[in-house]
Design a protein with these regions (language model features):
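Short, solvent-exposed loop/turn elements at beta->coil junctions and helix N-caps
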Residues: 1-2, 82
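Conserved C-terminal structural/oligomerization subdomain of aldehyde/semialdehyde dehydrogenase
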Residues: 7-123
Length: 123
């Protein structure tokens, strides 16, 4: 493996807005930490991203976290948890460029199904 392809575990914080890291779908041990004051402004910034596979939120106030995740465009959101908490009954899949369809959970069955709608009018 080329050394340039290896990401060592890292925590990145206080990045300036519109940086490359925020506009890339990363798979690896990289944590981008951002503090925020305005929940709606941060949600708008996150939803403007082209990717939406997963998001982890750490918040000391339950009401703030519930307010934050409402209408957030990510396929899976953890609040005060991490990606090692997986439940097979919950669908996995992303929004935007992060994938089409869902894996695991009941909704995954729809990927292997064909539906037909039939409308019968009275005679």
């Amino acid at each position: 493996i080329n050394k340039n392809n290896i990401f060592y575990s890292m925590i990145i914080k206080n990045l300036k807005k519109n940086n490359r890291l925020d506009e890339t779908e990363l798979f690896g041990p990289i944590l981008n930490v951002q503090k925020f004051k305005d929940v709606e402004k941060l949600k708008k910034e996150l939803n403007s991203n082209n990717y939406g596979l997963s998001c982890i939120i750490w918040c000391s106030n339950k009401k703030n976290s519930e307010k934050f995740i409402n209408n957030l465009r990510y396929g899976r959101v953890w609040v005060n948890g991490n990606i090692t908490q997986n439940y097979p009954q919950i669908p996995i899949g992303g929004f935007n460029w992060s994938g089409i369809g869902r894996e695991t959970g009941k909704s995954a069955i729809y990927n292997y199904s064909e539906f037909q709608s039939t409308i019968i009018n009275k005679i």
